[in-house]
Amino acid sequence: MIKKVPIVLSIFCFLLLLSSSHGSIPEAFLNCISNKFSLDVSILNILHVPSNSSYDSVLKSTIQNPRFLKSPKPLAIITPVLHSHVQSAVICTKQAGLQIRIRSGGADYEGLSYRSEVPFILLDLQNLRSISVDIEDNSAWVESGATIGEFYHEIAQNSPVHAFPAGVSSSVGIGGHLSSGGFGTLLRKYGLAADNIIDAKIVDARGRILDRESMGEDLFWAIRGGGGASFGVIVSWKVKLVKVPPMVTVFILSKTYEEGGLDLLHKWQYIEHKLPEDLFLAVSIMDDSSSGNKTLMAGFMSLFLGKTEDLLKVMAENFPQLGLKKEDCLEMNWIDAAMYFSGHPIGESRSVLKNRESHLPKTCVSIKSDFIQEPQSMDALEKLWKFCREEENSPIILMLPLGGMMSKISESEIPFPYRKDVIYSMIYEIVWNCEDDESSEEYIDGLGRLEELMTPYVKQPRGSWFSTRNLYTGKNKGPGTTYSKAKEWGFRYFNNNFKKLALIKGQVDPENFFYYEQSIPPLHLQVEL
């Protein structure tokens, strides 16, 4: 008992100092935290307030989009190291009448995981990043604060023929990636990352830790691509690992307009979704100014689950116009291919995947997306190419093939609905130097003009990846925003699954504690239809 006295005094003095120094932090929150951590010295290291030397570094550590560095800051940041810390954070934030924001990797394009227009507590999960791989069971448990790179590295340490169908950006947090769907180069073979979730642990609005069995199948359905932060704090996930061959083949082949790049892109639309599932063939349109002059390129990027000789046969049979040659191809194992598509130089140590900060320069970015149901005309593609060529700051266009496994999964299997009727998706991205603050709106307006340009050529109503959410699409006006109002943006991400998400939200979080600008609103059928 005597040994506990210094600990209790240390915690008491720490919290007393907080209450006297930060009148903006509600006393109810500090009192609750004091009670929850009365004998837990870890509070000294996991609670960060503006007067702490650690506050700014923790806040900025995983802000991937510097557009929001000047946004209103949280009253406090909690960086839990135990699941019980998450429970305490949820209970105390709710009791104090504050909002909570949940951040795993900070890659949210709108910064919604770490900013708010009203006073809030930031729950940063970066210290919850344990990974346990079970090769015999073809599964793994991974905590939400781990990055895609850390997860890939751990899989490769255990097996050269196992993988997971997640994205290519190694610094993205697993929590946000899985709960928003998660697409990558294996989606035609194995579907989305969220299609391969088999269990999860969530802290709900009542502070309870629930697994798949105790949360029930409805909530488990919702968090697999429906935006986990609308329903609770998912602290860990159990996922299914997939098989890959010992060697895969990759290539990136770029063509200018004069080299037939646009004609090849037009042809690609007719074959990409019909190719064998083992072949992922995406296309980008972007400015290659390495020569000093603005030059648009159509870049064909591929991952093939097999060897070069087999890939050449598939391409000769399905897309001979591209003219792929053996010397264009590189053979490597899957983990090195993941590094290749993440932008790491060939031969770089795999240990760089464990670096939580992106190896790429941080730039301001805004993004939108569409799903395409039928090939676009040459006229539409000509207008798109012309727009990209004439814009002073050319957007990046990424076209991702669907088909394969994506066409075999029901549109209601998980919240992500865009399956058999979609042949590919288009992602529009504008990137600029963050020091050019005065031109930010101009760049964002340019993205809006591009979206408007594509409107006649895109099936209506439009659909978008939830992971590319954009507040210009629409947003909640407060925790009282109704389902009928939220449909204006919600159907774009989830189509007819949006109503089911709202009904589940009404069951598990009727008071809408887990609210943010594009969270799922609770739908109570007896009140609102």
From Swiss-Prot:
Family to which the UniProt record says this protein belongs = Belongs to the oxygen-dependent FAD-linked oxidoreductase family.
Disulfide bond residue pairs = 32-92
Q: Report the EC code(s) recorded for this entry.
A: 1.21.3.11
Q: In which pathway does it act?
A: Alkaloid biosynthesis
Cofactor annotation: FAD
What are the recorded GO MF terms, alphabetically? FAD binding; oxidoreductase activity
Cellular location(s): Endoplasmic reticulum; Vacuole; Vesicle
**Organism superkingdom:** Eukaryota
Distribution of this protein across tissues and organs: Expressed in leaf epidermis.
- Glycosylated residues are 52, 293
Q: Which range is the signal sequence, renumbered to this chain?
A: 1-23
- Which gene name belongs to this protein? ASO
The molecule here is called O-acetylstemmadenine oxidase
